């Protein structure tokens, strides 16, 4: 991760002022499946990729932001940037077979406020987006009927979310300095069934 941040810093001529964590894995596994109990290493892997990966990026990016001078022309005195993490509605509405995924996204939600409070002294905000069902590469591989059925579960608009809608929220978070220490559900009022 340090190498990726080095590359970004070199390409953009300075440390990042906006970092978006938007990756994860979600392989389902029952706690008590037909093939036995849920392997602990499966649980640990999902937790480490989703929560550990988000934390790792945040800590490394925050160190670079904190060491940099405040943003020139920044609206707020001492502003250095924003870290935006991606959780999931599964953090709140976990489904059967998704104990590990829900726990990992719940951890992303849980670490956000302590990080926002700590990093505020350095002029760094932390915000988490909890998307519902979005047309991501993970879902694009599903048959169209499955995609349509997932979209119909969303009260309004009754469809899968679009990446452009996620991006629009990211842009708003960047521009609205009062958004700090918050989780924003982006789900069309979806509440996942068991």
Please give the residue ranges for each predicted region.
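Active-site helix of classical SDR
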Residues: 58, 104
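Conserved mid-core segment of classical short-chain dehydrogenase/reductases
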Residues: 26-44, 63, 67-77, 97-100, ...
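Residue(s) in the substrate-gating loop at a strand-loop-helix junction
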Residues: 88
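Short, small/polar-rich loop/turn modules that mediate ligand/substrate recognition or access, typified
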Residues: 120, 125, 179-182
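C-terminal substrate-recognition "lid" of short-chain dehydrogenase/reductases
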Residues: 162-186, 191
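Catalytic Tyr-x(3-8)-Lys segment
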Residues: 48, 145-165
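Alpha-helical segment proximal to the catalytic Tyr-Lys
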Residues: 63, 116-118
């Amino acid at each position: 991760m340090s190498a990726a941040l080095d590359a970004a810093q070199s390409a953009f001529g300075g440390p990042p002022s906006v970092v978006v964590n938007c990756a994860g894995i979600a392989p389902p596994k029952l706690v008590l499946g037909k093939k036995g109990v849920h392997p602990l290493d499966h649980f640990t892997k999902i937790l480490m990729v989703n929560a550990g990966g988000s934390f790792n990026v945040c800590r490394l990016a925050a160190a670079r932001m904190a060491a940099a001078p405040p943003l020139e022309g920044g609206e707020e005195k001492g502003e250095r940037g924003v870290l935006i993490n991606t959780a999931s509605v599964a953090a709140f509405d976990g489904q059967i077979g998704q104990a590990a995924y829900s726990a990992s996204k719940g951890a992303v939600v849980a670490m956000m406020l302590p990080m926002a409070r700590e990093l505020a002294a350095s002029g760094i905000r932390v915000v988490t987006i909890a998307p519902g069902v979005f047309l991501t590469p993970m879902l694009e591989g599903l048959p169209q009927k499955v995609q349509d059925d997932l979209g119909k579960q969303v009260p309004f608009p009754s469809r899968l979310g679009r990446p452009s809608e996620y991006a629009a929220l990211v842009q708003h978070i960047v521009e609205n300095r009062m958004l700090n220490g918050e989780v924003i559900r982006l789900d069309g009022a979806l509440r996942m069934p068991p």
